[in-house]
Amino acid sequence: MVCCFGKKDERTKTIEKELHKERKIMRRQINLLLLGSGESGKSTFVKQMHIIHGAGEFTADEVRAYRQQIYQNAISAMRVLLDARNKLGIAWEDPKRQVEVEKVMRFTVGDLLKGIDFTTFVEVAPIISDFWNDAAIRKTYEQRNLFQISDSCQYFFEHIPRIAMPDFYPTNRDILFCRKATRGISEHIFEINKIPFRFIDVGGQRSQRQKWFQCFTDITSILFMVASNEYDQVILEDRRTNRVVESRSVFETIVNNRSFSNVSIILFMNKNDLLQEKVPKSDIRQYFTDFTGDHTLVRDVQFFLVDKFEASRRDRARPFFYHFTTAVDTENIRRVFRDVRESILEQNLKTLMMQ
C-alpha cells in the first residue's frame, strides 16, 4: 500500500510540475487578437509574422495550396471584371475578344471553390492576359470602387506569363498577395526573443463577427486593421454602407467595450500604398462631406481618417496608438511590429505588476 501511494504521489508531483510550467508559459505568452472588417489585411499580417518571426519560408504543401489559390484568384478577378465591363457598357477595344469571354465566365463559384489545377489554368491564362491588355478591361478596373474585386488582382494579371509556367513555385511575395477569405478562427504562435506571441485571426465579414466573442478572454492586445484606401467603396454584404464607416462602427464597439479596459488597442491604417495611389484619383469629399483638408494630399486624408477613429473613443485618458502600414511590404511590417511589440510588452508588464 505504501508503495502504491508513493507512485501516486510521484505522478501527482509530475502533473503539478507540468501545470506549473504551463501556467508560467501562459503568464509570459502574449495573446494578440486581430480584428477588422473583411479584406483589411489581417491574414496578410499573419503571413508576414510567419516570414519575419516564423520559419521564413512556407512548407511545400502550403506552397502547392497557395499555387492553386493564385490560379483561382486570377480567374475569379477576371470574371468580376468581365461582368462589370458588361454592366458598365464599356465597349471592347478589340471586338473579337467577346468570343473568348465564355471561356473565363464558364467557371462557377463551385468550380473555383473546388480548386483550379495547372492544366485548367494554362488553358485560360493567355485569354486572361489578352483581356487585361485590352483598354476596355483597364477602363473597367479604373472604376473598381463601383464593384467588389480583390486589391491583389493587378499584381497577378501582370505576372500571368510567370504564373502559367509549369515550374511556377509561388514566392513569399506571391503568397502575400494571395487572397482567401478567413472562415472561423485560426491561431498562430511565434516565439519572438524567447517570448511566445499568439496571434488569433478571425474572419472580418459581418457573418463571421459573432465568433469574435469566443476570442475575448486572456487577450493582451487587439490589433485593429483598417483598409484605409476603401473610403470610396461599399461593403459586400449590403452594397450601401461605406467600408470605412463600417470599420469605424466596429472599432467604436470594440474600443468602448468594458471587457477591454485593460487591453491595449492598436489601430493599423493599412494598405497605405493603395491609399497613395487612390487619393489623386478619387476625391474623398464626395464620400465624407466633413473633410476640410486638401483632398489631393495623402497626409491630410490619412489624418482625417485617423481622427475619425480616434473620435469614437469615450475614454479620452486612455493612450491611443496608430500606425500607417502596408501589409504586403515585409520591411514596413517588420519595422512597425518592432515598435508595437515594445509597447505591448511594456503594457503587459504593468498589467502583471497590478495582479
Curated annotation (Swiss-Prot):
GO terms for molecular function: D5 dopamine receptor binding; G-protein beta/gamma-subunit complex binding; GTP binding; GTPase activity; metal ion binding. GO terms for biological process: adenylate cyclase-modulating G protein-coupled receptor signaling pathway; Rho protein signal transduction. Belongs to the G-alpha family. It comes from the Eukaryota. The keyword Thylakoid does not apply. Residues 266-273 are annotated as: G4 motif. Keywords: GTP-binding, Magnesium, Metal-binding, Nucleotide-binding, Transducer. Residues 28-355 form the G-alpha domain. InterPro entries: Gprotein_alpha_12/13 (IPR000469), Gprotein_alpha_su (IPR001019), GproteinA_insert (IPR011025), P-loop_NTPase (IPR027417). GO terms for cellular component: brush border membrane; cytoplasm; heterotrimeric G-protein complex. This is Guanine nucleotide-binding protein alpha-12 subunit. Transmembrane segments: none annotated. Residues 31-44 are annotated as: G1 motif. GTP binds at residues 36-43, 176-182, 201-205, 270-273, 327. Gene3D superfamilies: GI Alpha 1, domain 2-like (1.10.400.10), P-loop containing nucleotide triphosphate hydrolases (3.40.50.300). Residues 325-330 are annotated as: G5 motif. It comes from Caenorhabditis briggsae. The keyword GTP-binding applies. Residues 197-206 are annotated as: G3 motif. SMART domains: G_alpha. Residues 174-182 are annotated as: G2 motif.
